[in-house]
Amino acid sequence: MPAAKTLHAPYIHTPLPHGHASHGPGACCCGSPMLQQFHERVMADLSRRQVLGGTAAVMAMFAGLSVPSVVSAQPRQANGPLLLTNLQLFDGSGSAVQSGVSVRIEEGRIHSILPADATAEGAEVFDCGGRLLMPGLIDAHWHTTLAAITQTTAMTADVGYIHLVAAQEAKRTLMRGVTSVRDVGGPSFALQRAINEGIVDGPRIFPAGAMISQTSGHGDFRMRHDIPRGSTTPLSEQEHQGVAAIADGEDEVLRRTREQLMLGASQIKLMAGGGVASLYDPLDSTQFTERELRAAVDAAGDWGTYVMVHVYTPRGIQRALRAGVKSIEHGQLADEEAARMMAGEGAWWSLQPFLQDEDSNVYPDAARRESQRQVAEGTVRAYELAQRFDIKTAWG
């Protein structure tokens, strides 16, 4: 997946004492003026093309330090390279943490790893205070308009409110060290543009655009009184907002896929099976025919990208893989045959750690609670299958 191959920007934090898992006075400067200054300094060098290419360098700093003294002691330059010094480097490759190095950043890119005593050579020097420098994190399954609000709020609140909350949450996401997100369905193009143009702060967004769903599928958010739909029936509110696009038949799937590509989708999202939160489709339902799925795969392939699908069951997973789908979202009900097929096709398995605990969603009806139980029980088994069959996994 494109987001998984991105060269990520560094993320800096201070290792916390064993057992310390919460913020305390002097222990963290998430969202501090120093962090904001550093983010603005690096983002100033980025063009829209660099952001889309995944080359932006965005920093987040955690520490027990006196923010005003550090900021005032390190004057800023308007532009130019950065040299990060006095740090420990974790590169995410499995190697041991490195000490005695510095990192040079030029034009928003990590230019080189240098010895600790490397000369600045025109770069602004930023003392990291002995903190750990690590790659920015990827959230591979993110919904711009659902990250901070409930589905009910998303379906009933004013559109402006929804997008303002999304922008606020994007900045919070960046401050947590997540520098790239793969949006897996919804109206994220405007926020992506605002971030790219420096209007608001947030991670790089790889948008999918509207979730493409069959009638009665997991992305069909219409009410019962909206049925039936005739040739002159207007689009539903969720379709107008770009949350979902309903398509039945190969021709409609082609059209809706191409519309999202026209708007700037990095990848395409289809609903290939039932869900827990949806009102109409059973969890074990299989959605879209193989030919419909193949239509989306072909259209995406013509633009050099791929299709991901929401699906849980072995039947749905295998149908999607036969159609050429490259990313399975969820898949907690997969069996060994489906897992083996994912490995054989070289597909990505984008798992989410759904659990039935005190933080899980609360559903009023028994049917959805039962679906939730099945998915939660399947989560541990799915991770075990992914490890056993050496399947490429995405996290989010």
Annotate each PLM feature.
Residues 71-75:
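Boundary at the C-terminal end of the N-terminal hydrophobic targeting segment
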